[in-house]
Amino acid sequence: MAGELKVLNALDSAKTQWYHFTAIVIAGMGFFTDAYDLFSISLVTKLLGRIYYFNPASKSPGSLPPNVSAAVNGVAFCGTLAGQLFFGWLGDKMGRKKVYGMTLMLMVICCLASGLSFGSSAKGVMATLCFFRFWLGFGIGGDYPLSATIMSEYANKRTRGAFIAAVFAMQGFGNLTGGIVAIIVSAAFKARFDAPAYRDDRAGSTVPQADYAWRIVLMFGAIPALLTYYWRMKMPETARYTALVAKNAKQAAADMTQVLNVEIVEEQEKADEVARREQFGLFSRQFLRRHGRHLLGTTVCWFVLDIAFYSSNLFQKDIYTAVQWLPKADTMSALEEMFKISRAQTLVALCGTIPGYWFTVFFIDIIGRFVIQLGGFFFMTAFMLGLAVPYHHWTTPGNHIGFVVMYAFTFFFANFGPNSTTFIVPAEIFPARLRSTCHGISAAAGKAGAIVGSFGFLYAAQSTDASKTDAGYPPGIGVRNSLFFLAGCNVIGFFFTFLVPESKGKSLEELSGENEDDDDVPEAPSTADHRTAPAPPA
């Protein structure tokens, strides 16, 4: 049995020590960069529209055409989806460590290249931006399954959830840093190159130097990724991959002897026995019987969660404008608009996003993944309905702060809820040789949801009145009806959570069935051994 391997028992029972925190920082900085890169584009899209699609005859500032806006906002998600599938599969074939370095260098190169452009025409700049952001997303996609898998395989079973959640929580700091960098850059440029509002001077409201501002914001994301490359390459391969997949238990024991500072002598025969017994593939009947409903649960929950999460997150600036929390665009210069959009996103990250992530870190190994995910979907539904039902009340003068508070609570329960748990659980419940692949499939389903949100919300949230839509967009269903739709997505996630097992306090081998003989596995998982919700107290 896998559970008889001394090296895995040593990892499961290890006390929390320095190498755990080192792994959190190394893996977490990748997610810091991921979040910074994916969300920073929403801070500069209005500026891009003013610079490259300026029309002197228009009463409103230039904006990205619908197809260009959809491409700029969504192309990184397309790359991320492809990267999650490809690097997730590759991580199980080549090893976590080897592939980890590839993804990071791809992120660094494409992050820097995102700020470059071929020519100065709108078409040339947008084509360059979309090309490099696709490949940036491809690298980011690999970071999802690999970071989660590496952290889960390094962690002890008592605090594994908190460690994986801490890696994911670095996204919150990535969002916050993106807003802060954009605030500093826009404020510095505005102080040096001040400009009048658009309605006072249409051409003069966007100074030529503003073209550098968005490039600096996007390129800054390469710095934290570059700083962690050396340390990623120094990490040894995870013991679970080396012993259970590469079938070299002695090397796994040697690696973990250095990490844990204890002497571990492993018997190769035990690892060979596990490898002989655990040979079924992803598309086999045995995988379907053991893990089919689990994979369905993780993919559907992540898919519907990301529809709601990314459609709201990417277009915060449009929602703020709708409730008049931001001034009208023609009353601001280009850099002033960038500053105020960045300030709004920074406040939401600080008040609604970061606290939710760290609540998950502190409570996930106490109350479990199931309760947090179920509760998160429930409260997201409640708060979105609370925004949608009295939507006209929230958009009247004097009620805007209440809207923002409700919106912040929605994000709090997304992050102290399914946005964290959908990342954590797939790294725990699948066999070692398929763990990275299954996490990549689950994450790719999430990014498919993000694509639906980021492309579809551009059109769906448009006013039903054709005279009030953004330039180039057909009438949509409006923000209010969009919020009803997103609440419905959360309801679906609530019910599919019941397909996902509770993983608190169990070893990875116990959860994946690698401790069981094939003959011991029932056709349908029993209630006692594969309980979805925690058992009630006796």
Swiss-Prot record:
Extracellular side: 45-69, 120-123, 185-210, 316-346, 391-396, 462-481
Region (Disordered): 507-538
InterPro entries per the UniProt record, alphabetical: MFS_dom (IPR020846), MFS_sugar_transport-like (IPR005828), MFS_trans_sf (IPR036259), Phos_permease (IPR004738)
The keyword Transmembrane helix belongs to this UniProt entry's keyword annotation: yes
Membrane topology note: Multi-pass membrane protein
Alphabetized UniProt keyword annotations: Membrane, Phosphate transport, Symport, Transmembrane, Transmembrane helix, Transport
Gene3D superfamilies: MFS general substrate transporter like domains (1.20.1250.20)
Biological-process GO terms, alphabetical: phosphate ion transport
Compartmental location: Membrane
Record topology, Cytoplasmic segments: 1-23, 91-98, 145-163, 232-294, 368-369, 418-440, 503-538
Keyword Plastid: no
Transmembrane stretches, start-end: 24-44, 70-90, 99-119, 124-144, 164-184, 211-231, 295-315, 347-367, 370-390, 397-417, 441-461, 482-502
Organism superkingdom: Eukaryota
Coiled coil: none
Acidic residues: bias regions: 511-522
Family: Belongs to the major facilitator superfamily. Phosphate:H(+) symporter (TC 2.A.1.9) family.
Biological role stated in the UniProt entry: High-affinity transporter for external inorganic phosphate.
UniProt-recorded name of the protein: Probable inorganic phosphate transporter 1-4
